[in-house]
């Protein structure tokens, strides 16, 4: 849901750093001979992902531990490249892993900054796409809920069931608003989030956004986050009204509403770098809700 800048390290840098951790010269030299193939596959990955067609990548199937995937490199060897090299605290490449883990500001891009990053997610799962086991643009900092839940277990076989790729996907998912909310009146009230994509989007893109939203349980997770914050906003609203009436007893409902929106809600609503951020959507919802301001 949230756009991330491309990884700081190139695939070439990653491959070279991993090779430094290989103690056997013949193993290292054999690995290095496959660099052109790895880089060719990365280019294919980039092209497909940028157009929402990553699901069409021709994966190796059937896939057993001894299946050859890249030249004479087997599935199990490529998986160990990640587990026993990139993640190994005693290997040179581990510094790259640690850098990636905090590259998103320790906030998970899949769920829109709700979760704290604790893992690296293989966007295309390593069990099915071992050739991308250490490719930086396939390694996304992720919270446990996103990484260990449905996102980490599945891969798409059609366009509409693809999750949104934080590094390289269509700009519409990051630059346009497609998450909205309603204020549910009560004591103290609640915020209900839903998907409403722009009318000019392709149906496939609308379905993708909705699928991502449902796959990662965004509605419930946004609702819980907003619920923690709503009582604070209500307190701010009540205090604001009290102070204004102290100095201007003739202030009308419309004036109080307008001034509170301008002073307290609009600064967050005007944030443009992440239009589907839960707090921005929540504040937008409150600004448009007569029920939220009823009784002030």
Curated annotation (Swiss-Prot):
Gene3D superfamilies named in the record: 1.10.30.50
InterPro entries: HNH_nuc
Designated name of the protein: Protein ea31
Record CDD domains: HNHc
